[in-house]
Structure formats: structure tokens, C-alpha cells
From Swiss-Prot:
Pfam families: ABC_tran. The keyword Hydrolase does not apply. Part of the ABC transporter complex PstSACB involved in phosphate import. Responsible for energy coupling to the transport system. ATP binds at G35, A36, S37, G38, C39, G40, K41, S42. Its EC number is 7.3.2.1. One of its GO terms (molecular function) is ATP binding. SUPFAM superfamilies: P-loop containing nucleoside triphosphate hydrolases. The keyword Membrane applies. This is Phosphate import ATP-binding protein PstB. The gene is pstB. Signal peptide: none annotated. Its main location: membrane. Keywords: ATP-binding, Cell inner membrane, Cell membrane, Membrane, Nucleotide-binding, Phosphate transport, Translocase, Transport.
Amino acid sequence: MIAKTTNLNLFYGKKQALFDINMQIEQNKITALIGASGCGKSTFLRCFNRMNDKIAKIDGLVEIEGKDVKNQDVVALRKNVGMVFQQPNVFVKSIYENISYAPKLHGMIKNKDEEEALVVDCLQKVGLFEEVKDKLKQNALALSGGQQQRLCIARALAIKPKLLLLDEPTSALDPISSGVIEELLKELSHNLSMIMVTHNMQQGKRVADYTAFFHLGELIEFGESKEFFENPKQEKTKAYLSGAFG
């Protein structure tokens, strides 16, 4: 287990958005969060790196490796908890600098050789190096959408996170680019724990080891993906998976 929540409640003003969420996130596995828009998936995801702190009141416990996130320095926390967003958000810098910027900021690089090796390694991990090796000094905005999203994943990997959060990482991409990202995530999960929000149930079924279904801020069902999709226990889950609501 890499992380867990215990009796997690979250309020936007007087409106409660999450209700007593208890969940364990397993080490080196992909956990998918599914449910209709506004059900609390992304809100829950952002509790792990404290992105809700300024806009919400949070009760309960969120732990990563047994440590309460609210007692951690937020910069140190976000080094250990990477995030990839729905829209690719590359820095307006070169491809090379997109990878090297954060490790240098965190003092992780001792010399130029280390820096270059890290950039190559991260780009290779996301299958991008061969595509960009001759244009590392080019502005990252010149890449295609799918390439930009892989660069964002490589950038997140550069600071060696223990947990990677993905908020609908393929929803803005074409089917071919989405497939490339899905295969990449499955490969990365051998050495990295991930939580992924997705509106694509088939994607969750293809990629995730565990799946959680949220409805109106409540965790309705959570379990291993094969059992979750083939033999759901809760009536609301059955209805959602069959398209009866959501």
C-alpha cells in the first residue's frame, strides 16, 4: 500500500463534496476513478497533493507511506506526488528544459552529464526520445498533442515521484495517441503507483488494476478491476456500468 484515505470528507463552503471516503491505494498498481461529471473524482484525486487546500475544508486523513499529507511541506509533498492534467501543459521552454527544470530546482542534479542522462532516460521511458532526439532544443509547443502529453508524463517522472496522479490524461487526445498513453501507463506501473480519473469506462477496464466508482461524492464500490467490471456488487454500480444513469 502506498496511500490511503480514512473518513475523508470535503466541503466547498456549506456544500459537502466528499462523504467519508475510505480507500487504500496499492503499491505499483493503477487505480482508476470513474463516475459521472461532478461526482467527486477529481476532488478526491487532488486531496493527495493538497491542491484543494485553498478552496475547501477537509476533514479526515490522507496518508502517503503512512504520513499525513497535511503535516508535510507542500513543496516536498508535490515532489513525491506528481500530476498530469487533462490538457497537455508543457512549459514554454525547450523539450530538454521541460525535463531538466524541476530536478534542477530541487537540487537533484550535480552536473551536466547527470542532467543529460536524466533527460534521455525520462524521454526513453515514455517512448519519446527517438522522436525528438534531434530537436531537444526546440520549443515543446511544437510537438503534437500526444507527444506533449507524453512529455508531461516524462516531466513528472523526472523528479522520481512515489505516486502519480492523472486527471483524464487522454480525454483531449485522438484514439491512437490515447492508446500509446495507455500502454505507457501499464508499463510504468511496474515501478510506479498511479491514480487515474477517467470518464472512459473501457479505458479503466483496459488499464487499471483497481477501480473505484463515485456517485454524488460517495464511494459506491471499489475493488479489483476484473471483478468490478464483470461482477459488480452494488446496484448503483450495475446501473452506471449498463448506462442506466451517469
